[in-house]
Each structure stands twice: as structure tokens, then as C-alpha cells.
A protein has these predicted regions:
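Acidic- and glycine-rich mobile interface elements
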Residues: 90-110
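Internal alpha/beta loop-helix hairpins
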Residues: 1-17, 21-28, 56-58, 131
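Short, conserved beta-turn/loop elements at beta-strand boundaries and strand-helix junctions
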Residues: 11-16, 78-84
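A generic beta-sheet turn/junction motif
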Residues: 15, 24-26, 50, 82, ...
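Short, surface-exposed charged micro-motifs
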Residues: 10, 77, 88, 117
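Glycine/charge-rich catalytic "coupling/switch" loops of P-loop NTPases
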Residues: 2-5, 35-74, 103-131
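Short, acidic/hydrophobic/Gly-rich beta-strand patch recurrent on exposed beta strands
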Residues: 19-25, 30-32, 86-92, 99
């Protein structure tokens, strides 16, 4: 599970759905929730969490994309398996991991130290209270 510390900057709720904007090192990230956690208040620090299997990977220019959460990084580790592969990168001193198909690794011709973008849909982000 990926966990990044961020601060809630804005909460918008309509018809039971909440859009939570978060400041992560000056970058705005978004989480969409069906139930607003009781600890979620504007100005509070939280962990944003998302599974490695929910992290998409792109190489090259990705200006027109619907994903709300984009992390520009360089691949640090790449472990190719027969069907699935894992890769990780550091973004603002936080390790982010991704699990994608080995076919995708080969199609994108990914290698360690390559610049990439990690993508996470806002609906795949959960919040965790910092205690």
C-alpha cells in the first residue's frame, strides 16, 4: 500500500459524494469518497493511500489525461516477472510502488532510471487518519 502525507485544503460534498483536495508538497491531489471520514477536516494532515495495483504508468508526454493524481518520477527499481512486474520510484522522499503487467513494461520499454509518470484515479485514493 502506498501512503503519502498530505494536508486537506478543501472539501466539497454534494449528494453524498465528497471531493477532497489535498496539498502534497505544493501539488494538488484529489480523493473522491462516498462517505466522508469523521477525521477529514480542512487544514488537517492525513495519509492518502492507494494500492500498487491502482497505479498506472506512462512514459513520455501525458498532458491530456483524465487522472487527477499525477506523480512525475524516475524508476528506481524494476523487477520483471513472467506475468506481473513491480516498479518503484521516489517522489518528494516518499516511495511509490506500482504493479503492472510485464507486457506493459516491455511495450513501454521501461528501464531503471527512466523518467515516468505515475497516475492514480481520485476514486482509488483513500484517507487515513494520522494519530
Amino acid at each position: 500500500m502506498n501512503r503519502l502525507r498530505a494536508q486537506i485544503t478543501r472539501i466539497q460534498t454534494h449528494e453524498g459524494i465528497s471531493r477532497i483536495l489535498l496539498n502534497y508538497h505544493g501539488q494538488t491531489l484529489t480523493a473522491i469518497t462516498l462517505e466522508l471520514p469523521s477525521f477529514a477536516k480542512e487544514g488537517s494532515d492525513v495519509y492518502i493511500c492507494f494500492k500498487e495495483t491502482e497505479v498506472g504508468v506512462a512514459k513520455g508526454n501525458c498532458d491530456n489525461i483524465s487522472f487527477s493524481n499525477i506523480f512525475e518520477c524516475h524508476i528506481e527499481t524494476l523487477n520483471k516477472g513472467v506475468i506481473l512486474s513491480t516498479l518503484s520510484a521516489t517522489h518528494h522522499s516518499h516511495k511509490i510502488g506500482s504493479i503492472i503487467t510485464t507486457t506493459a513494461i516491455e511495450r513501454l520499454d521501461l528501464k531503471e532510471n527512466d523518467p515516468i509518470n505515475f497516475f492514480v484515479k481520485a476514486t482509488e485514493v483513500s484517507l487515513e487518519e494520522i494519530v
